[in-house]
Amino acid sequence: MTPTPVPPATTPTPVHRRVEMVMGLPISLALRGPHATGVRADAAWAEVLAVLREVDRVFSRYRPDTFISRLGRGEIGVDDCPREVAEVLALGEEARRASGGAFDVRRPGVPLDTDGVVKGWAVQRAAHALATLEDTDLCLSGGGD
């Protein structure tokens, strides 16, 4: 019987992590590969944060000046909001139908609440900024509830 050669041990590629609070959530990014550090990674992370901060500016229920807060109070209509508001409300309607009404962003007697759909939508949208990091593994996460 001939022994099977064992390949030499390789050093695992390090994972580089970044975390910042945005939208009241810890937003974390883990990168591994040739573009995990450096100018490109820094620029991509900055773009991720810019996208999420803009989402917070439009959708935060905790700030009275946001479009979603003003819409919920009836001060403005959907047509007065950025187009992303209609997109997120449509996702909320899809979730309401799919859940048989158990999930509803427009529950009677409760302020308009898109949080259940907007967080995932926002992280997915922000992830597009990471497309420039070819051959680099990544994990973008928006923690919280």
Ranges and model annotations:
Residues 140-145:
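FAD-binding core of FAD-dependent oxidoreductases
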Residues 1-139:
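A contiguous, well-ordered beta/alpha segment that forms the leading edge of an enzyme domain
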